[in-house]
């Protein structure tokens, strides 16, 4: 739609098509009915729920260490807006090139879900979190050392697969900590902290890009990803193993 020569018409048609496809997907959700949970906690006020948070974190140290590690690793997302800008400076971007790079990013993320899902079923989401973080680190480093057209396509495929595995595992692993009744609170805590970190990251990335260049953004993002992954590796045990140990059986 955009073609070799970028134009307002090409971009407009792209946005309209994206709007139509997104609307179709959202409308299809109207037919989905939420299943009835086996147990439901007694309804309490928001203030009462907030007062329970410190006790929840104290009683589940593994989860507490996890969401801190996740927040640190999420800071690594600061590089996401700058990958395409760096690629534009290094190889130049036409509509066709942008389409190919976006296609590699999207398709790698889509197909990798099958691989990440198989790994999660067999070994748990913790391993997916670690592997996807390391893949993200490798892809970012490759973009720095070999900014050619072919390598850029490969790098964006790696980033697409890594980001998809990271997002899926970082959210899904929360479901495996602790008891079922406090699961919504754990999800809220982990997502809130991660989104705060995800919001701060691009601001820091923008400042680094302005003062020191895009390379500094990627190096800093790699640092956060490595630190987050190391914290999970050394201080967050596999939740399934913890649950099996607490119940006296192996799942």
Map each language-model feature to its residues.
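Short amphipathic helix-loop junctions that connect adjacent transmembrane helices
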Residues: 81-98
């Amino acid at each position: 739609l955009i073609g070799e020569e970028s134009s307002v018409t090409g971009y407009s048609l792209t946005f309209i098509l994206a709007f139509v496809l997104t609307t179709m997907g959202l409308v299809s959700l109207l037919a989905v009915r939420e299943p009835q949970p086996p147990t439901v906690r007694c309804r309490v006020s928001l203030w009462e729920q907030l007062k329970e948070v410190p006790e929840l974190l104290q009683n589940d140290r593994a989860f507490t260490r996890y969401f801190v590690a996740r927040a640190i690793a999420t800071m690594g997302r600061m590089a996401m807006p700058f990958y395409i800008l760096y690629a534009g400076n290094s190889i130049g971007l036409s509509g066709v090139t942008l389409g190919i790079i976006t296609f590699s990013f999207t398709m790698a993320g889509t197909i990798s879900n099958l691989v990440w899902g198989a790994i999660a079923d067999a070994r748990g989401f913790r391993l997916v979190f670690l592997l996807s973080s390391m893949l993200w680190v490798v892809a970012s480093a490759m973009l720095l050392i070999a900014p050619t057209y072919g390598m850029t396509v490969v790098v964006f495929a790696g980033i697409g697969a890594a980001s998809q595995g990271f997002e899926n595992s970082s959210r899904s692993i929360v479901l495996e900590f602790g008891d079922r009744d406090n699961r919504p609170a754990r999800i809220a805590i982990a997502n809130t902290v991660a989104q705060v970190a995800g919001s701060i990251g691009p601001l820091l990335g923008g400042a680094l890009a302005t003062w020191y260049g895009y390379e500094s953004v990627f190096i800093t993002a790699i640092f956060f990803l490595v630190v987050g992954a190391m914290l999970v590796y050394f201080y967050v045990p596999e939740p399934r193993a913890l649950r099996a140990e607490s119940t006296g059986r192996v799942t």
